Amino acid sequence: MKNRVFSLAMLSGSMDDAIIIPFLDGLVEAGYQGVCPHPRNGLKVPYPSRLYWQRLARFIELAQARGLEIWHYDEFPYPSGQLGGVLVEDHPHLASQTLALETITAAPDANGFIDIGRGTLVALARCRLDDKSTFKAIHDVTADTGMHLDSWICNEAHNLGYTATTHIHREDHERAFPKRISRYYAPETPLQDNEILIAIKATPGNANYQGLHKPDLTRPEVTQFFADHIYTQLSQIGAAHHLANTPIFQDEVTFYSSFPWNEEIHQTLRSQWGQEFAGNLLALFNTNIHGWENARFQYRTLCADLLEKNWYITIKEHCHRHQLQMTGHLPGEETFGGHAQIIGNAFKNLRHFDIPGYDIISSTLPDDIDRCHATGIKLVQSAAWIDGRKPTMAEAFGANGFHQDLQRNRTVLAWLGVHDIKQICDHATFSDSRSLTKYDAPPIHNRFNPMHKGAPDLWKWFQWFCDLMDQYQFDPQTLVLFPFDALTLFTLQEKQWKAQTSLLESFFHYLCAYSLDCVFLPSHQLPEVKATADGFIFQGHHFSHFIIPPFSSLHKSTFEALQQWQQLPGFCWVLPEDTTGITLFGEDHPKSTFIPITAAQIKNCSEDELVKTGANWFADMLDSPLHQWQSPRSVIKSLRINPQNQEKLLVIINPHDDPIEITAPYFGAPLPQPPEHCAMEIITEKDISKVLLAPRATAIFRHQKSTSIKINSPTYRTITPEKCQWRIAGDNFWNVKKGNLHLESHTQIPFATKAVSALWTLTPNATHPQFDYHPLPRQLKLEATFPLHLNTIIPSLSLILDLDSMPRGARWFWDEYELPHTIRDIFETQNNVYDIPTSLLTAGAHQLHMSATIENGAQGILERPILQGDFVIAGEYPLHLDRRSHQWQDAKSTFPHWREVGFPEAFGPAEYSCDFIIPDLTTGNILLELPSCIGIAKITLNGQNVGRNNWEPRLIPLPKVLLHDGRNTVQITLHGSWNNIFSRLNYRENGLHQMPVLRVHTP
């Protein structure tokens, strides 16, 4: 069955027929093909009692009678659910634990002993630091710790009235020695001023939703408990209802701790590390410790292996014995601050899932997809391709708001790129969440929509999604090495590592956002890649480029495998952040070795090749900041560099056709480079250095101080005319409904951030573009010409068209010049971007010409052709709200105007206007309360300017001298660089998001 839409049914309430039957009927009516029962908070049937299994069997029976397919999504037995918490309540020794560091500051007592406090001690390290707080020596002194007898609780019979050494009363003894158990360190020699004690202790892991502790999934007895209590019952219900191979969907399996710990991990690492045990544990937290890469690699690998052995393999074998199939989300790992991330080689656990493939989870992503989710999505996508599995999308609509998730998941699809994601639609896909709670029941989950009968908009969206995916064909061109052994990735919650990882992390995020045709290659499969004269072969597929990210450390075997390809065309090793080299680690490297890598060795691609392959990551970081990145909508203001008193390299590539200005308090001299690669001018004003970097040029700087660097890139504004619809009709030609474009000069307005040189207006009665097509047996050649006229020279201009609606392989020309294009993410959709060289933007007549080949009889719509450049928009206002008259009711009352705030489908200034009547000019002062808005708002009263509002909310007084007796008109004109861009997608960020209000203020 194809294109199945499931409802994730929240089993709350009593699960009576009176609730279940209307719910299932509503799903059938709305067009769902399946239902996924999911016990959740608010369930009023004891779980997992016999009554619960009876009610669940009844639910399945009713669903089958209506032709609905059944999956079972049981979060309760998993770590995020309640049953895991109950397990720990009954068996405390099965709770998850995590490592934690504690610096011991207690002074020695009279005997020279140091109190290291309570808690489960794993190791005690005595560390010597240099003047830069770098660890120079670490000694494991755990053997020198023990209980101090004087601190024991004295309630035994022989301690009631005296001790072995003194004859004092019990009360005096307890005052002298409090009732507590503590450990003490007995040093052989006193601590020096440059020495510290660090205790490594095991503490409880994170709690679940209800505050219950979570189980340790590296213990086999935990897995067996879940299997016995849940899977056996599910298999019996499935057999009774002839549901062979009922799928069991696993929720995000995780350690639920940053540094999981138990006896098996302790014993294994103690035997491996010996005398280096305490030092290697400290190295998990701190990169200033010698050998941290190797220690972290061994630790993560051990944890991943235990999770695979004791959870995934055990659960899979149990499911198969009971004719169940296992699938689920990518393992969630809190160590890396994300819902779907990588821990060492735990990514291989995906291969234990049976159906339907690898889940590219979208669920309830935030409005601005964070880099963890985006990278996780891309990695699962690559894993599905590498392993020959089908990508699927579970929880396509999460539980936190159906209509919002409709917008967010379109964003997710954009991140997935061109990876043949139509396969997602060929397999079962969870959809929006429904609660079975009655209307009059207590609000168990306010975010759920109780008794919501179906979702026609979901179904329409899903069908649109299926149709859209028909256009995608995945043909990967670029391999990107993803290092399962470079364990400095995605450590967003660990502040000590963040400075070390931000560069590599941003690089991966950039590739996820912009390199839609790349596949992430696990480092352990590197030997399978074969180099050829024109590219690289992996699993029988050809790749034109192979990108190696800017690693600061690599496993020795990985490094040696890469060295052989350094001179091959298409091979690009991006410059590491540290100029001195790369740290190698491995089994035959007990000590880390620094291997010097020069720029000449690792940067073998020409600048054009870097642009084509997406390796010019820093260039696009001009528009997507390294440390401040939140979404593709962000524009960089400054970039903070912290070299930590070490000389660093800063690589800046200018991808634009105009120079960019770089300003910093200090710049070292640029590295010598051939003139064709570095064209710049350095201007020194007092302590400020300015560098003008020529178009399409690259500069590499040395800098030795922490500095704020300001990079002024061209400010782009994106606009579009009214929606254009080009449709391939049955007569095999393009029918242009609207879309003739015209550019005219315009006077600069006071609040423009740059010189206004042009504006975009529609010419409704202009001649339609001419077309020439040549019928072919199976294909048609499509050509279209658009005349334009520039009354003045403009600084920059780009043509942007949606990939969703572009004819495949379309070529665009500006006059006779073919426009080279890139793929750029403009807000929430991918686009072909055609940059027009500034030398061609002369005043006068021009034409845009498109040439493409299409399938005979195909249908499609080309929406929203966009011009992007340094100009603002004027012309006819795309939005006029109905003007309404209001009478004053109370001099101090607040009354609404602007009955609703709509958002225009076209681009340009949004106008909001309202009429009001003043019966008496002696009324108090009238203030216009304007909410915060994106852009700049210009306010007029009866045609006269009264002020403007920039970003922040404020109260604007309406001058009495401009007020009329009777009718008055207030008009707000909203301009802005982001104003009304893709308004249907970003409706919360366009125009005014709240109603303006007129207030009367009586002194």
Predicted regions and their residues:
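Extended acidic/polar, glycine-enriched regions
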Residues: 149-239, 686-714, 843-845, 854, ...
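Repeat-blade elements of multi-bladed beta-propeller folds
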Residues: 925-927
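Beta-strand-rich ligand-recognition modules
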Residues: 804-867, 932-992
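Acidic/aromatic-lined carbohydrate-recognition and catalytic surfaces
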Residues: 38-183, 199-224
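Short aromatic-centered micro-motifs
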Residues: 127, 536, 629, 682-684, ...
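Carbohydrate-binding surfaces of carbohydrate-active enzymes
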Residues: 3-6, 10, 14-22, 32-36, ...
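C-terminal accessory/binding modules appended to enzymatic or scaffolding proteins
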Residues: 643, 910, 931-933
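Catalytic beta-strand/loop cores that center a nucleophilic Ser/Cys/Thr
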Residues: 122-155, 159-161, 610-645, 915
